[in-house]
């Protein structure tokens, strides 16, 4: 069909005009952020409705939107456009008819359309016409009941196949894990148009024999891709290390090592297509001991960098070996074959559950959202004589009814929805009537099982002319944002989005083009605020999210204050003028909301009004928790925690001492029995007895009341009898608290409208809501319409726009927890699980599970890139990127290493390693000319990158900078105060202090120093205190940070990098376990380290940190030889010893108070001469102290003398034996310090 020419005075761009008027085939419009897609969609509909020739009635258009709000907005825009047309032509009956038809037009979400289909054609699938939509929690509870009955039946049948499945997926205590697995698989299968067919496809992954070829199995493609990426990544690192040997001062002696390593890696790459060959070669790879590099002519920084690169390559090869080649191909295949009958049983169990669940819902005449789609699909589908699926009569009706099917946000469609759309549209792609609008770069609903590959497949298949397939139209002109926003977004995503990471190539067609007109503003540059959370302190490496959000909130608050007090102008779309920025022009975007309360608190503390739609906190409210505890006790009084909670609450009013008195009645029995025993003593008539008697009598009354009344009536009876509703009203925030209690009552009433009844089920209903995180939320004091800073998730911001955007929390790690499960589900591959031996109870990942993990990691990273794209494209006039890192210099060096390439697109390997948004942004941004001051010379980059028009303002912030008071604000406050005094006016409140209040607030506890002394101290803590003591007073001049860790970090946190203390712990662990029968060789030491890792006494990071040379070197020293000759050796000797406080704290106010000192002595050994004490140290010596160890010795002696004195005192006190000698051994340099 010929395209209608665009009028000369048209406001539309050529591409927009093409999207408005093109027809005659399926059309896919790839509409970038801010490109006006909604306006184009509405205009297309209006032109069809008001066409002079062959106009289309509005009810002959099916318009599918993603949300109900979008549908309402679409109808509103169409109504406005029709009203304008009617004003031009008041006599038009056709336009008046369209306005009357608009309310019944099919402009809705797909779920709403499915509901229409079901109401019209319910009889085709034997559906009760009186069906209703089930509450989500109601559906889950019904599903639980069905599943319980199914499992009971399976157990009763004595089905051996079921027992084998249960043996593998249950514990010896319950079968909840297997129930969760069945529900999860069932729910996931519902995203497929034919769930049973998809479930049956599981088995093909496990349908193998020992003769099967690994390369022919469905999952092997992802195994091969991952292994290839790791091998090429290792090669890349070693090539870089080899380059460093050629640099001035580089570690030239290690060139041979790197060449040998490279040769081995290249041999692996040459046979990467052959799994059997890789199995033979990967385990045989051996990285020889690195040659020593000594002398002043070598640059230590280059040596360290080369060492890190080689270690990185070693870790990659070790990971490939661990993932794929610790077992032979035949063993892998046998594991899959062994799991086949188990998987078949699981599939049948899930299918049975699905059928029973559907029958249970039909019995109650309820359906859920998943049923809406599947029942609609069933109505629209028929089977012909040859067994093929074809459109049913109902589908043909809709094909005739709808002139065109228009789909908004097509990138978020799933497979079931696509099947429905294909059945209601007419014609094939080349002559169809399906009009799809979306942006695959904004597909961010993977958790709802959206399928962006549907969009990508059509985008690759369709052509611009529409010849041979559908037509694709690109709308890439952005009418929302300044050029600064677009240029910076393009600069980042050209480097980040492409290939398998991103799933779409960010090429010239995808890049954003300027469409809006703004006056020049140098302050509109995109800003990066990078906060160094370490701030030079080692202990801050383990800073929790709480600290990170605190510093980011301070930085953001400072920028907001500067913005609102500056002449920064924003364009107001309502007044069509530029005006000063207001709080409501600013939004803070977060990936998720856990940070929101702390951010809000900090902003409020700084006087910045802020609003967030928080949907949590309801169940944690004290009044709601108390009311729920009462209900739990009414249901079952033998629940200790709810009962104690009620007794402690204002409802009964017991204090801790009274609770203890009750418990003393029956120490081992349930608390309810203790309470009854207390009441059984008729001689008691004290206040506690009266309180308990009143409560007990009320409880019996409520329990009786609950048997013949509804839950809502019971709740109101409790409120009335206890007066708790009125009491809550008198508490701070009383109106809110009463509202919360009313919500609980209302929730009980709505629960009773479901198919369930009874108090027990209501409590399970509430527990289910809490487990799912479906919090009812609490009301907020500020509304969204007020002049406040908005705080929301990136997902919530989709489709919105704001003059100023802060994208915060960029350093937070991505949530990859799903990848650590014992099983994974994938739409393409099916079900991947661990191999589980039913008798030995051992398990390990099967290759399908590993393959799915690698595939899903790519998909998750692609999704995160799209989420970041959405965040950046919300900004109209100013964009801030805010993130924190733990060691800025190290982070910058890492980014530079990743960015050292000429291509625009960063390597897939480096992007695959990303664990946060900063890991994406940093390597891309460090190539920018505005980052030149923060990188070292010599970065490879193209001229295009250097000439890119984007502008950034890079700011590296220390925590100390954020603590400093603003001098300008301080001067303003001083000026206000002086002015008030001069004019005889009251001094502003911030300077007014009441004397009595001042005395109260400034009073200090006279024995405060004693509160800082714990009755139990470790030697390490005392040693740290000693380091800070002033030699004259003994008091601490520089106190250790409150962030200092008192406990060892768990292993999973060590993956983020080891502290010096953790490296020291690793060395001590090796010295504790290494055999002392003879001088160990390097190979024997390595075997010891490997053994400790396999026994999980060392983490992988600690294993890598061990310096074998330093351990071997120790046994070559005189003290090492003495140790091997010893008559008796005790390692890691724990002790506890009581000392007067005065011996530890010089000026403690109660010097005679006993203090328990604990410690662990590294090594005690006895020779013919006597008892010797040896302590190992991993302090860095070389290059840190002037004059080497000679200059370090006095400092180290003073540092450790307290520790060794306490060790000596403990040994002599406990063994009654004099210590003959004491020595410290320093691994760095092999130095011995005798004390």
Swiss-Prot record:
The keyword Nuclease applies. GO terms for biological process: double-strand break repair via homologous recombination. Keywords: ATP-binding, DNA damage, DNA repair, DNA-binding, Exonuclease, Helicase, Hydrolase, Isomerase, Nuclease, Nucleotide-binding. Its EC number is 3.1.-.-, 5.6.2.4. ATP binds at residues 31-38. Pfam families: PDDEXK_1 (PF12705), UvrD-helicase (PF00580), UvrD_C (PF13361). It catalyses: Couples ATP hydrolysis with the unwinding of duplex DNA by translocating in the 3'-5' direction; ATP + H2O = ADP + phosphate + H(+). Its cofactor is Mg(2+). It comes from the Bacteria. Disulfide bonds: none annotated. CDD domains: DEXQc_UvrD, SF1_C_UvrD. GO terms for cellular component: cytosol; DNA helicase complex. The keyword DNA-binding applies. Residues 509-799 form the UvrD-like helicase C-terminal domain. InterPro entries: AddA (IPR014152), DNA_helicase_UvrD-like_C (IPR014017), DNA_helicase_UvrD/REP (IPR000212), P-loop_NTPase (IPR027417), PDDEXK-like_dom_sf (IPR011604), PDDEXK_AddAB-type (IPR038726), Restrct_endonuc-II-like (IPR011335), UvrD-like_ATP-bd (IPR014016). Residues 10-482 form the UvrD-like helicase ATP-binding domain. GO terms for molecular function: 3'-5' DNA helicase activity; 3'-5' exonuclease activity; ATP binding; ATP hydrolysis activity; double-stranded DNA binding. The heterodimer acts as both an ATP-dependent DNA helicase and an ATP-dependent, dual-direction single-stranded exonuclease. Recognizes the chi site generating a DNA molecule suitable for the initiation of homologous recombination. The AddA nuclease domain is required for chi fragment generation; this subunit has the helicase and 3' -> 5' nuclease activities. Belongs to the helicase family. AddA subfamily. Heterodimer of AddA and AddB/RexB. PANTHER family: ATP-DEPENDENT HELICASE_NUCLEASE SUBUNIT A, UVRD / RECB / PCRA DNA HELICASE FAMILY MEMBER. HAMAP family: AddA. This is ATP-dependent helicase/nuclease subunit A. It comes from Bacillus velezensis (strain DSM 23117 / BGSC 10A6 / LMG 26770 / FZB42) (Bacillus amyloliquefaciens subsp. plantarum).
